[in-house]
């Protein structure tokens, strides 16, 4: 699907002054605007309110048309705070949807929902912009080839592989490592695939956004010396912003990613943290627009809004957008309408477990709960499929035996079950891995493990060849050779102590 990018539109002062409206009512972030007969703006048009407030401060608020109310009035949602606006203020119809800068000049920069840079590094060096509202690519433009997207993270590549051009959900509560996993993926994609990423911070903490930016600069994903060599563009609409901004910031990030796919013909990674906040903002806006809520207070248009965003994230014959979306699960209830609607669009789910995080196993990906539609012999091959299934069976058997072990102890198990438990504990530890972006916490250099190395390592553990090695040798290592080297070092250390 080709974008027809436009050059930046004229300044507001140069807009045709004839299509002017006036504010008739303000309800929080929602404005009712009256226009002259026959001059009604279209749905999704951007409106601009310029003027001065009661103390003489300059006001410049952009809004988006959401409803036509009749009687020459429209209802619009503001993209920034509405403090200082008054009834009777002049509103200019721009005649087009919100447009944001796109292209290579966006890399290494931070934008808000309107595509304005907010990193104090000056204006963006591009005149190419694209509207944030577009239809999904037509069926004939889609690429249907199934291919694995190698991440270099063992637990993901082996047990819940990502699809190139697919959508992946990252499920987890607070503090189990969603953001660290996202940062590692951005780092690995940039270094191993040379691809670009777009990060959409939707309704999350400002502090986290700042930390992410600083850590990206430290890890080299954002190159401060030569900003053009950066591998990621950041778009933030944080928790403190009005619901209009949080509802549209995901589309701003997606529009930037679409340009890299369609015009630059690149494989792009789109991160959305957090897709639940997109739904939450839509729910707030829906209530403000006076719509009747549906189940659990969510907006009646929940499926439509989610679909219009998700269907644009896909592979075309030009390139692909692979999307990784953090999904906050309210009260750990997966049947809540927000996560349940998200599930319908996903090709793979990576579930983070608090239990594994408590054991110190990072990434804390639950190997039994995480799933992928790609884990089929005809896609990944027999060897990968068989190894993954045997790893899951071993871990499942260990899970079943844990109650018996807790009550009676290991000694009461049969010889075969004891062997299964020993191998499962090695597998559990071998699924951990030192991350590049977490070097400051772990003190261990990060490791990228190829899929072939991952499969070889788990096959060796399952075959019983490494039964003699201590389980701590498998903790926080890269490939299996590092585990055997670590075992030798541990043995030498224990001999020295004797």
Curated annotation (Swiss-Prot):
Its main location: plastid. Gene3D superfamilies: 2.40.10.170, Bovine Mitochondrial F1-atpase, Atp Synthase Beta Chain, Chain D, domain 3 (1.10.1140.10), P-loop containing nucleotide triphosphate hydrolases (3.40.50.300). It is an enzyme of class 7 (translocase). Its EC number is 7.1.2.2. It catalyses: ATP + H2O + 4 H(+)(in) = ADP + phosphate + 5 H(+)(out). InterPro entries: AAA+_ATPase, ATP-synt_VA_C, ATP_synth_F1_bsu, ATPase_a/bsu_AS, ATPase_alpha/beta_chains, ATPase_F1/V1/A1_a/bsu_N, ATPase_F1/V1/A1_a/bsu_N_sf, ATPase_F1/V1/A1_a/bsu_nucl-bd. Keywords: ATP synthesis, ATP-binding, CF(1), Chloroplast, Hydrogen ion transport, Ion transport, Membrane, Nucleotide-binding, Plastid, Thylakoid, Translocase, Transport. PROSITE patterns: ATPASE_ALPHA_BETA. It is a peripheral membrane protein. F-type ATPases have 2 components, CF(1) - the catalytic core - and CF(0) - the membrane proton channel. CF(1) has five subunits: alpha(3), beta(3), gamma(1), delta(1), epsilon(1). CF(0) has four main subunits: a(1), b(1), b'(1) and c(9-12). Produces ATP from ADP in the presence of a proton gradient across the membrane. The catalytic sites are hosted primarily by the beta subunits. PANTHER family: ATP SYNTHASE (PTHR15184), ATP SYNTHASE SUBUNIT BETA, MITOCHONDRIAL (PTHR15184:SF71). This is ATP synthase subunit beta, chloroplastic.
């Amino acid at each position: 699907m080709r974008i027809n990018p436009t050059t930046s539109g004229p300044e507001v002062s140069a807009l045709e002054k004839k299509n002017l409206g006036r504010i008739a009512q303000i309800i929080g972030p929602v404005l009712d605007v009256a226009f002259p007969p026959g001059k009604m703006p279209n749905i999704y048009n951007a409106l601009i309110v310029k003027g001065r407030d009661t103390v003489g401060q300059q006001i410049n608020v952009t809004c988006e048309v959401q409803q036509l109310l009749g009687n020459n009035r429209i209802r619009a949602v503001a993209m920034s705070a509405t403090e200082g606006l008054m009834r009777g203020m002049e509103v200019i119809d721009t005649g087009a949807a919100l447009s944001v800068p796109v292209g290579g000049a966006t890399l290494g920069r931070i934008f808000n929902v309107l595509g304005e840079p907010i990193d104090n590094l000056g204006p963006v060096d591009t005149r190419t912009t694209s509207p944030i509202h577009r239809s999904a690519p037509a069926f004939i433009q889609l690429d249907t080839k199934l291919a694995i997207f190698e991440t270099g993270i063992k637990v993901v590549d082996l047990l819940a592989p990502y699809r190139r051009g697919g959508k992946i959900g990252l499920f987890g509560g607070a503090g189990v490592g969603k953001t660290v996993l996202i940062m590692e993926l951005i780092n690995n994609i940039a270094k191993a695939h040379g691809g670009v990423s777009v990060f959409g911070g939707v309704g999350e903490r400002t502090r986290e956004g700042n930390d992410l930016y600083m850590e990206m600069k430290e890890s080299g994903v954002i190159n401060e010396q030569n900003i053009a060599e950066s591998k990621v563009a950041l778009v933030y609409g944080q928790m403190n912003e009005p619901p209009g901004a949080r509802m549209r910031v995901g589309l701003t990030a997606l529009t930037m990613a679409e340009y890299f796919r369609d015009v630059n013909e690149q494989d792009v990674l789109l991160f959305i943290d957090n897709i639940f906040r997109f739904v939450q903002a839509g729910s707030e806006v829906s209530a403000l627009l006076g719509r009747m809520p549906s189940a659990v207070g969510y907006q009646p248009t929940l499926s439509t809004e989610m679909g219009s965003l998700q269907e644009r994230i896909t592979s075309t014959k030009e390139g692909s957008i692979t999307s990784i979306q953090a999904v906050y699960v309210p009260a750990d209830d997966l049947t809540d309408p927000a996560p349940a609607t998200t599930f319908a669009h996903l090709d793979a789910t990576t579930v983070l477990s608090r239990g594994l995080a408590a054991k110190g196993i990072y990434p804390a990906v639950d190997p039994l709960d995480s799933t992928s539609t790609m884990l089929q012999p005809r896609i990944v091959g027999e060897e990968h499929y068989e190894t993954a299934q045997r790893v899951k069976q071993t871990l499942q058997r260990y899970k079943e035996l844990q109650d018996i072990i807790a009550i009676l102890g290991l000694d009461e198990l049969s010889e075969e079950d004891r062997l299964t438990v020993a191998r499962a504990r090695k597998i559990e530890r071998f699924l951990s891995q030192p991350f590049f972006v977490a070097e400051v916490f772990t003190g261990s250099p990060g490791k990228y493990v190829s899929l072939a190395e991952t499969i070889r390592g788990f096959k060796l553990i399952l075959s019983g060849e490494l039964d003699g090695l201590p389980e701590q040798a498998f903790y926080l290592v890269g490939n299996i050779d590092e585990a055997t080297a670590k075992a030798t070092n541990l043995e030498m250390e224990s001999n020295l102590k004797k």
